[in-house]
């Protein structure tokens, strides 16, 4: 049966489908007096089935094993009863009285149907090529043509906005006596200044609608107004709004819209949002969820032994826009992150605090990697960012010098990698000006002399439509400063459409950007509208991304080249051509799990009454973790959305659900190996095994 038809079945129609397609299963259920007998008879049936040891047979046995158990669901911290097959028995014997969606029984139908079907054929290279090429990029001429008209419309609106501003002290104001044409030309010139976009950013639904040509629906406007009344921050620059397509024809901009327009679920839950990443919750004197002791405040986040995140008390606590699926929405809700720029300028106390934060890195035995983020690292002014990098440099010098007095086996890890986390290459590429490039170049030159070997801008392009001529120029400048750029994608519904991610990899690779992570959306209710089931991520990994896979030797050779060449873009283009690859599959598809970190190693152990899969995750065995990992072991997560609900959502976006029909089969995942570029270099000495700043007692 076609996916579209199955997704529309009623419960009674679905019951008839079971009787027609899976008569043996129905017979076992009818002959079983209760759920326990059903599971026992099902166990016997599976044991004698010719496919007992294939993936389908193993999956059914796992569902039998966990039925009737309770597991601790880590994200909500509650006990969760599992009764997947007990519910199926009730359904097949006419005892199911609940008014419910069909999603649970559709998924179970697919699992039992797998016992009788051969393994599906994977899509061909030509098929994936066709699916990839349907997605335009911001470098395409027809896209640029629409955006030129958008820009002109927005420029006119900005002239009117400036005319009505009551702040003559602003650097962006009109002198008396200017004609409209002169004002328009002046605004056109200011467009190239990132400060203009921050000053003119949209902060209200009404203004947003005006800059989008009054194209938003009444329903959307009502929702955004409700969000504003609840105190949700709203911030979108004129540049980013010019990327949206308001014409009703041309390119599909859903991947852009879903990032700046809030869903009903997000608005409804705002105010009660919890931190998904439990290690982000810091209490003075107490270890975080990963067992790390951290300085007071919320400036350092840490999960792994080798790396910690630094969030400065500067404008770096703001962003160039608020992403609807932001992992730090919890911090925006608590006002630790915000868009009130005047309040975010560094205070006199920041320099003193920065020295204390640097001491944490300096005195830690294992830290060798610092990720400066926020907010957004590049939102800090050039001078402020330069001061932060200077502090990092001085800390690294002191740590290296102190090691000279320590014997072999007791030396501390020295700083090897510096990263800046920023979405501004996509949100506001004008920020990448000559002053910033010079700061980055100078820091790399001097830091390279003290053992720091990797300098990375960790950016976030969500769709090839964000890769504009301005973004391409910003990327070129950053690469020219000697820093590598890698990309992290959030695999929301719009980005998960077939071929979309392969196209993004392709476009970014051509410009010299290496893809790093493809993140599943966190599974709390506020993200329900944009959540993509992990099964789709595994499907993408095994069916689409496989055409860019590198051999271990090729991956090593490429990482060596990227660490030495002056032109990463030319290097990657040559590599792709030589190895006949459409893109580089260097990113890992993962979910950021509460406390234990990134992983895609899971098994499905049950399904909720709503059809949401219950996944048992294990940690990523390819990297070092906090010792607390031995105590946590495997963890359980309920997904935010059923597979059936996800497919219906894709259909509503114009997708053919049949293109995704193998998604049901992906009930287990395995975390991919890291691209060798991201492995830490060996030290020319032996460091201590002792972990400092650890407390996992209790």
Feature annotation, model-predicted:
Residues 2-19, 23-30, 39-50, 67-68, ...:
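Radical SAM enzyme [4Fe-4S]-AdoMet core and its adjacent flexible, acidic
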Residues 2-304:
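Flexible, acidic/Gly-rich N-terminal and inter-domain linker regions that tether
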Residues 236, 542-698:
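C-terminal accessory regions of radical SAM enzymes
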Residues 236, 292-331:
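N-terminal pre-triad scaffold of radical SAM enzymes
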Residues 302, 313-317, 331-342, 421-422, ...:
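Catalytic or ion-translocation cores adjacent to nucleophile or general acid/base/metal-coordination motifs
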Residues 304-308, 322, 364-373, 418-421, ...:
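Glycine-rich, often proline-containing surface loops adjacent to acidic residues and nearby aromatics
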Residues 355-362, 378-551:
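Conserved AdoMet/S-adenosylmethionine-binding subsite of the radical SAM
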């Amino acid at each position: 049966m076609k996916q579209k038809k199955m997704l529309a079945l009623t419960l009674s129609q679905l019951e008839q489908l079971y009787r027609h397609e899976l008569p043996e299963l129905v017979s076992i259920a009818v002959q079983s007096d209760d759920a326990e007998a059903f599971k026992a008879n099902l166990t016997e049936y599976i044991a004698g089935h010719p496919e007992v040891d294939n993936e389908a047979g193993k999956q059914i046995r796992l569902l039998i094993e966990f039925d009737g158990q309770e597991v601790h669901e880590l994200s909500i911290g509650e006990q969760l009863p599992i009764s997947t097959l007990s519910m199926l028995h009730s359904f097949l014997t006419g005892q199911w009285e609940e008014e419910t969606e069909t999603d649970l029984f559709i998924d179970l139908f697919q699992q039992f149907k797998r016992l009788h079907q051969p393994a599906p054929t994977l899509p061909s290279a030509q098929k994936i090529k066709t699916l990839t090429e349907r997605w335009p990029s911001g470098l395409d001429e027809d896209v640029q043509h629409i955006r030129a008209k958008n820009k002109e419309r927005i420029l006119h609106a900005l002239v009117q906005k400036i005319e009505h501003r009551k702040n003559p002290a602003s650097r962006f104001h009109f002198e008396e006596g200017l004609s409209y044409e002169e004002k328009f030309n002046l605004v056109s010139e200011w467009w190239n200044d990132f400060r203009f976009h921050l000053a003119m950013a949209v902060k209200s639904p009404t203004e947003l609608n005006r800059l989008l040509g009054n194209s938003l629906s009444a329903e959307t406007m009502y929702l955004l107004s409700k969000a504003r009344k609840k105190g949700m921050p709203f911030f979108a620059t004129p540049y980013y709004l010019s990327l949206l397509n308001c014409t009703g024809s041309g390119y599909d901009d859903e991947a852009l819209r879903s990032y700046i327009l809030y869903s009903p679920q997000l608005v409804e839950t705002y105010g009660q949002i919890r931190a998904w990443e439990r290690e982000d919750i810091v209490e003075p004197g107490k270890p975080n969820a990963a067992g790390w002791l951290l300085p007071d405040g919320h400036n350092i986040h840490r999960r792994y032994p080798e790396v910690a995140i630094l969030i400065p008390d500067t404008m770096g606590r703001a962003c160039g826009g608020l992403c609807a699926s932001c992992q730090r929405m919890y911090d925006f809700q608590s006002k630790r992150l915000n868009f009130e720029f005047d309040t975010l300028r560094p205070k006199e106390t920041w320099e003193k605090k920065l020295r204390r934060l640097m001491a944490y890195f300096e005195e830690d035995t294992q830290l060798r990697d610092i990720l400066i983020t926020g907010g957004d690292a590049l939102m800090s002014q050039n001078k402020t960012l330069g001061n932060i990098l200077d502090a990092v440099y001085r800390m690294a010098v002191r740590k290296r010098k102190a090691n000279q007095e320590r014997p072999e086996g007791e030396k501390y890890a020295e700083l090897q990698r510096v990263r800046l986390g920023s979405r501004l290459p996509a949100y506001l590429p004008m920020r990448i000006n000559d002053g910033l490039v010079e700061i980055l170049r100078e820091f790399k030159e001097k830091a390279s002399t003290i053992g720091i070997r990797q300098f990375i801008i960790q950016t976030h392009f969500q769709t090839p439509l964000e890769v504009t001529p301005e973004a391409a120029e910003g990327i070129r400048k950053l690469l020219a400063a000697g820093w590598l750029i890698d990309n992290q994608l959030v695999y929301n519904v719009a980005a998960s459409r077939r071929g979309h991610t392969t196209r993004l990899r392709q476009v970014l690779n051509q410009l010299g950007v290496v893809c790093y992570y493809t993140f599943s959306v966190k599974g709390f209710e506020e993200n329900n509208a944009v959540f993509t089931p992990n099964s789709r991520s595994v499907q993408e990994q095994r069916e689409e991304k496989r055409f860019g896979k590198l051999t271990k030797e090729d991956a090593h050779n490429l990482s060596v080249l990227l660490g030495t060449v002056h032109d990463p873009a030319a290097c990657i283009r040559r590599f792709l051509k030589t190895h006949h690859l459409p893109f580089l599959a260097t990113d890992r598809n993962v979910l950021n799990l509460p406390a234990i970190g990134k992983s895609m190693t899971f098994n499905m152990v049950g399904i909720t009454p709503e059809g949401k899969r219950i996944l048992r995750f294990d940690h990523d065995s390819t990297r070092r973790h906090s010792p607390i990992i031995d105590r946590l072991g495997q963890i359980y997560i309920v997904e935010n959305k059923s597979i059936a609900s996800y497919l219906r959502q894709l259909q509503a976006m114009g997708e053919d659900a049949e293109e995704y029909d193998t998604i049901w089969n992906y009930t287990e995942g395995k975390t991919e190996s890291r691209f060798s570029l991201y492995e830490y270099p060996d030290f020319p000495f032996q460091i201590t095994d002792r972990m400092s700043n650890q407390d996992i007692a209790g």
